[in-house]
Amino acid sequence: MTDPDSYRSSITSRPSFNRTVTSSSQNYGAPGSGNRVLKIVTETHSSSVSSGLSPYGQNAASTIRDNREREKKEIMELNDRLASYIEKVRFLDAQNRKLDADLKMLQGRFGKSTGSVKVMYEMEITTATNVVKQTGKDHGETEKEIRKLQDQLDELRKKFEEAQRGRAEDRLKIDDLLVTLSNLEAEINLLKRRIALLEEEVARLKKENFRLTSELQRVRIELDQETLLRIDNQNKVKTILEEIDFMKRGFETELKELQAQAARDTTSENREYFKNELANAMRDIRAEYDQIMNGNRNDMESWYQLRVQEINTQSNRQNAENNYQKEEVKRLRNQTSELRQKLSDLESRNLLLEKQIEDLNYQLEDDQRSYEAALNDKDAQIRKLREECQALMVELQMLLDTKQTLDGELKVYRQMLEGNSEGNGLRQLVEKVVRTSAINEEADTETMRVVKGEHSSRTSYQRSAKGNVAIKETSPEGKFVILENTHRAKEEPLGDWKLKRKIDGKREIVFTFPSDYILHPFQSVKIFARGQGIANPPEVLIFEGDETFGVGANVQTILYNNKGEERATHIQRQSQQTTSS
């Protein structure tokens, strides 16, 4: 029998625990026998998600996400209830075995130290009462903390709703700015098109001006040639006139000689004949000469007048066209300058609007991330407190049930110790000492055999990420590792990133991504060890360095970027435990 002075109660409140069971593979053994494997997954993930989908895509994504969250919560509640039932059954089973052993011990040794049994159970009742009071006090503090956190959550929800309204207003403002930007871009394109047309017109006019200038130059060259030809002809006329004068003088000299000869001729008939012939010849020569001179003079005058008239007409037309082209070029230059000035103003305004839109988008994303992070933290705290409160309530109910059971058993023990009205209770128990001792030994042996057959294996996972890339899953057998990009619209370049896997703090396996590898939004990549899968880039890669990523009781998988910074972690811990009462 245990000494009452050294006896310590075994009734204590169960340690608080955070139940975040999200694994879909759980194996619960039957109460009191077999192996029990409980897989606990704790995920910590922080990432920035920007809204890059259309409203219909966002509604569909939010609906799917809500359904998944609701299903996960239902699974978590069912897992909690199942674990609670199993733990309650095991606890009651162990409690029954302990009480049965105590009862048999008391029955076997009754009459030797009955007073110590009473002291032991009074200590048990006192300890259970203190535990109930302490549990009630913890329950009240937890309720106060929950109400306080509920107020903070309401305040944060109000702020979040205000942020949502501000976000909607910013969206409307952004839409208006986008409409304005589109109009400005359309106007800019129209002005650019007009400028291009005007530049084409200016080029055409320049070509026409060059053609007319070339034509004018050609006409001037022809005029110079005609002028030179006229001067040449005038010189020829002068030369011919001089020749005519010379011939006239020669003819006159010859005529005088003939007259002198005729004068020397004494015959009057001969003199008259020669005189008439000479007069006729001179008249014919003079008439022919005058006719030739008049014809040449008329031809030259008509030709020169025609050429001068043509040159004057072309010169006047060319001057008029040049003046019109100069005016048109001046007008086009002024219009081009005005359009370029307006285009510069519109481009400046466009840059300002784009800068404002970019600033508003950054501010909106920062506000959304901060509010979502705050709400997630508060929701996690409230969920944790509720789980603790629920566990305390279950524990309190179990303690109350235990107290009631102990009260009933104490009442029975008192009746057994005090005996009935005939006073034969103690005597009957003393007579059964030898027989109950044998039964007690047999029961203890069987109980130890059952307890030694119970083993529990506990595997826990913990994930964290500092960005959009997270370690989604690792194979417990070391066959593969899966990474995912949680962002909706942003690509993540993973070139030269390293995936390190540490096995029990001893072995280290390193996989390096290709230098040009990019992980697309909402996509995942599965990395197989050598011989464990078939390569299908970019969705499936093969690690040629080893046939396995390694297995162990403590496995750490860490993702580093090309600068050596830690971006994501995945920790797997496995422990096996043998329990006995």
UniProtKB/Swiss-Prot annotation:
Linker 12: region residues: 259-276
Spans annotated as Coil 1A: 75-106
Region (Coil 1B): 121-258
Sections of the chain in a coiled coil: none
Annotated InterPro entries: IF_rod_dom, Intermed_filament_ifa/ifb, Lamin_tail_dom, Lamin_tail_dom_sf
Single annotated GO MF: structural constituent of cytoskeleton
One family name in Pfam for this protein: Filament
UniProt keyword annotation of Coiled coil present: yes
Annotated region described as Head, given as residue ranges: 1-74
Linker 1: annotated span: 107-120
Tissue: Mainly expressed in regions of the hypodermis adjacent to muscle. Expressed in longitudinal stripes where the mechanosensory neurons interface with the hypodermis. Also expressed to the uterine seam and within the uterine-vulval cells.
Keyword Hydrolase: no
Location(s) in or outside the cell: Cell junction, Hemidesmosome
Role description: Cytoplasmic intermediate filaments provide mechanical strength to cells. Essential protein, involved in attachment structures in epidermal cells that connect muscles to the external cuticle. Probably acts by forming hypodermal hemidesmosome complexes that help mediate muscle-cuticle force transduction. Although expressed during embryogenesis, it is not required for embryonic development of muscle-cuticle linkages nor for the localization of other proteins to the hemidesmosomes in embryos.
Oligomer and partners: Forms some heteromeric filaments with ifb-1.
Name of this protein: Intermediate filament protein ifa-2
Organism listed in the record: Caenorhabditis elegans
